[in-house]
């Protein structure tokens, strides 16, 4: 707590202020010396964090003496910038700026251990620089009170619109009902200060008396009696010549006629008695009404009341100045400590090689790198999908060349590396055709879960290996032509095959070779389909209009005769199917050249990065471009089923009874 320890006389212009002392200006006639205690650094060990203190000591040892001196030096601009941001009260800001300028100009050590140089630089004393414990206590124990002090100032504002604190508002300058204020300021005064406060100037007291008489509208006679009582107090009138004078009323008062002073007894009880007479005046007990002083003793009491009013106003002014100056000094002290602490922390971080801001930016950059890495992985994944799609999609010219090669190849050509039919026994037509989904659907997309050669959805009549296994693998021309009937694997390779249809033999041998055939699915040889005629096969022209024959149920015999007519050599149904698709592809080649499915897919954009399917727009465009595809495909499938059924009934109707499930 600050104390008033001395009075500065006008003759003592160069008063020797000690550490933590500063002048307190009360009025034109009174200036006191305000002293602050140094017990702020004498703290209990429980208030100090041991772990944080050890860390601070390590940071303190990292700095050299030169670095420490530079770190514990801040300019006035840094202090004033923090001041304008933290303090809402205009009066507090002006008082802090005034005190900073006063300390800088006079050189007083009011902010010890802080000091302000002539150039306006705030620094710390050498004893605190070298002692890490004191420095820690100053920064993190005393300096932590800044926020609480600012909160206190904000709470003491007078009204929501008024940003001034209670010490700098206009209302506080008016005297209020007596309370403990005068006692608080009276107790922190030294005897010298009390004597100075108890010394009342006669002219000031007379001015207070005139205001009092005017306020209560005393009559002229009563005013004269009050003035006579005042003259007796000041020694201008001999009390022995005044009738009705009471000496007990002025007990404890002493006047100096030559100097014009009135001395009051400095005892606390007497001061309380004098102030007690003026309490009704501040509490509102006396209304503005006409008052009288008919006798001298009553006039003496009125003078004593005015003396109490004057003393209370003086004590209230001292209390207000004292509290405002203490708040100003503490605010400037805490602002300086906070600025030094920040400068010290910045210097320590620079010595360590990384600052908090750099660490923050580093964390942000790491997060951005992680996000970029994720985006790069997504782009690579998308590119892999796109490349895979491009590889799976056959080019238009490749499809053309493949169809042309199939049409130009000799009838006895084997695609998958089967044995050529060079012997006389095997001069019959041998053909192996691998029909893929790409050839049927003209698309690079496949159904999920199916291999490129899969036709599982063909209901047992598919030409692929996987599609025929669950359905009509045994006893069908398709299975025999595909090489999955396993005649060769059953041990019949050494026998010469008899003339006629080999599929009939498949029906007879399928039961025996069923188990052996299933164990050899990984490697299947192609067995040529023998035709009944050994003559060389001729190219049979096929027109797409023949699809009408397949679509007509009444012309099933014509279709059968077309395949088995004696004018033409016996041909496997695979051959007719190749001719069908070859002609159909040639008729639609011009349309595909206009815009292929690959071009449609390349033009379309994926709606999302994770899209794996063809969009509905692409499917709709494909259907509009190839309108005859599904119709011809269904007609061909129906024709194939009917041909196979008629073939089985014509050759061996008894076998069809037990194999109905395989056919259907």
UniProtKB/Swiss-Prot annotation:
Its main location: cytoplasm. InterPro entries: GGNBP2. GO terms for cellular component: cytoplasm; nucleus. May be involved in spermatogenesis. Residues 452-475 have a biased composition (Polar residues). It comes from Xenopus laevis. Residues 376-388 have a biased composition (Basic residues). GO terms for biological process: cell differentiation; spermatogenesis. It comes from the Eukaryota. Keywords: Cytoplasm, Developmental protein, Differentiation, Spermatogenesis. This is Gametogenetin-binding protein 2. It is found in: Cytoplasm. Residues 375-425, 447-476 are annotated as: Disordered.
């Amino acid at each position: 707590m600050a104390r008033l320890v001395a009075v500065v006389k006008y003759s003592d212009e160069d008063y020797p202020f000690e550490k933590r002392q500063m002048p307190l200006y009360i009025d034109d006639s009174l200036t006191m010396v305000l002293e602050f205690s140094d017990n702020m650094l004498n703290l209990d060990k429980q208030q100090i964090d041991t772990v944080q203190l050890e860390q601070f000591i390590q940071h303190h040892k990292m700095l050299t003496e030169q670095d420490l001196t530079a770190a514990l030096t801040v300019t006035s601009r840094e202090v004033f910038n923090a001041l304008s941001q933290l303090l809402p009260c205009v009066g507090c800001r002006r008082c802090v700026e005034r005190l900073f300028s006063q300390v800088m100009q006079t050189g007083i050590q009011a902010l010890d251990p802080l000091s302000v140089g002539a150039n306006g630089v705030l620094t710390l004393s050498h004893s605190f620089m070298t002692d890490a414990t004191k420095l820690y206590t100053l920064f993190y124990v005393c300096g932590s009170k800044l926020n609480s002090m600012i909160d206190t100032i904000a709470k003491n504002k007078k009204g929501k619109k008024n940003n001034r604190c209670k010490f700098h508002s206009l209302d506080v300058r008016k005297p209020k009902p007596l309370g403990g204020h005068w006692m608080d300021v009276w107790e922190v005064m030294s005897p010298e200060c009390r004597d100075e406060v108890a010394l009342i100037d006669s002219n000031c007291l007379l001015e207070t008396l005139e205001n009092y008489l005017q306020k209560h509208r005393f009559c002229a006679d009563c005013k004269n009696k009050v003035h006579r009582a005042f003259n007796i107090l000041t020694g201008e009138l001999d009390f022995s010549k005044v009738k009705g004078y009471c000496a007990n009323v002025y007990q404890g008062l002493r006047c100096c006629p030559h100097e014009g002073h009135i001395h009051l007894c400095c005892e606390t009880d007497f001061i309380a008695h004098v102030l007690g007479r003026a309490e009704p005046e501040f509490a509102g007990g006396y209304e503005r009404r006409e008052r009288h002083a008919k006798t001298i003793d009553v006039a003496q009491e009125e003078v004593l009341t005015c003396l109490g009013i004057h003393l209370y106003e003086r004590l209230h002014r001292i209390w207000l100045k004292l509290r405002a100056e203490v708040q100003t000094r503490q605010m400037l002290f805490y602002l300086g400590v906070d600025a030094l602490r920040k400068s010290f922390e910045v210097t320590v971080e620079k010595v360590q090689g990384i600052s908090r801001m750099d660490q923050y930016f580093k964390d942000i950059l790491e997060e951005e790198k992680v996000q970029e890495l994720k985006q790069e992985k997504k782009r690579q994944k998308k590119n892999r999908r796109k490349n895979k799609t491009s590889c799976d999609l056959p080019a238009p010219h490749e499809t053309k060349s493949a169809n042309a090669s199939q049409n130009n190849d000799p009838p006895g050509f084997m695609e998958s590396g089967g044995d050529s039919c060079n012997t006389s026994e095997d001069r019959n037509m041998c053909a192996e055709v691998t029909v893929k989904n790409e050839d049927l659907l003209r698309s690079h997309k496949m159904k999920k879960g199916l291999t490129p050669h899969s036709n599982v959805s063909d209901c047992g009549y598919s030409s692929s290996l996987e599609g025929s296994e669950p359905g009509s693998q045994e006893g069908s021309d398709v299975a025999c032509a595909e090489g999955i009937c396993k005649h060769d694997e059953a041990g019949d390779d050494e026998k010469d095959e008899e003339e006629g249809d080999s599929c009939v033999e498949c029906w007879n041998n399928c039961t025996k070779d069923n188990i052996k055939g299933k164990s050899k699915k990984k490697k299947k040889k192609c067995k040529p389909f023998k035709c009944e005629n050994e003559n060389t096969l001729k190219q049979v022209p096929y027109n797409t209009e023949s699809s009408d024959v397949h679509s007509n149920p009444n012309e099933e015999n014509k279709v059968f005769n077309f395949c088995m007519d004696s004018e033409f050599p016996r041909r496997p149904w695979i051959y007719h199917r190749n001719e069908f698709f070859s002609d159909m592809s040639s008729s639609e080649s011009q349309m595909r050249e206009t815009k292929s499915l690959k071009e449609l897919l390349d033009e379309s954009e994926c709606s999302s990065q994770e899209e794996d399917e063809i969009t509905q727009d692409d499917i709709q465009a494909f259907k509009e471009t190839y309108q005859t595809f599904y119709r011809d495909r269904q007609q061909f499938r129906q024709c194939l089923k009917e041909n196979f059924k008629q073939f089985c009934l014509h050759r061996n109707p008894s076998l069809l009874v037990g194999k109905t499930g395989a056919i259907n």
